[in-house]
Amino acid sequence: PEATEKKIVRSALETDDAWFNSGDLMRTVDVGFTLGYPHYQFVDRVGDTFRWKSENVSTNEVGEIINGFGQIKFCNVYGVEIPGTDGRAGMAAVTLQDGVAELDVDAFSTFLRSELPAYAVPLFVRIQPDIDVTGTFKMVKGDLRKQAYDIRSFDDTVYALLPGSDRYAAFDLAMLEKIEAREAGF
């Protein structure tokens, strides 16, 4: 009973409402023929974790925080390897809300650093036009993990939170080469 109660969010949107946090990530979609009733689509099952700086990081918890930033439509959080470090650093692939042309990097940096512990703030953010999903609408993480922050393998914009900085900066080939040479200071 106590564990179940922890999964129930009360008064989330209205007084006395209740929501059971099942661990499934859903989204509302317009399928065009529901006669005004909402249609929900399964997006992902939450619960993935990775270790960074000797801490366990929940991709679900980080993703929920990122989704709380007004410019973000969807995000997919995963861990990526950095040569010469233990564990995996956080990386988030995000899509921007309709009508948002460019991520406000300063506001996003401030938001994440105020909402997450330092070890959980993703070191890399990849801006994608769409989030890839499987036939069962599960977010695809495998290819993203393999590509990581190697901007030679895709055309998306990447921002990095560099060591000693409190703000994301545009990621370029010079920084990629420093990481590969283990000279970036992570």
Spans of features found by a protein language model:
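AMP-binding/adenylate-forming catalytic core of the ANL superfamily
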Residues: A3-A120, D130, G135-M139, D143
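AMP-binding/adenylate-forming catalytic domain of the ANL superfamily
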Residues: L116-M139, D156-A181
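A short, polar/charged loop-to-alpha-helix boundary motif
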Residues: Q147-Y159
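Long, low-complexity intrinsically disordered regulatory regions
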Residues: G185-F186
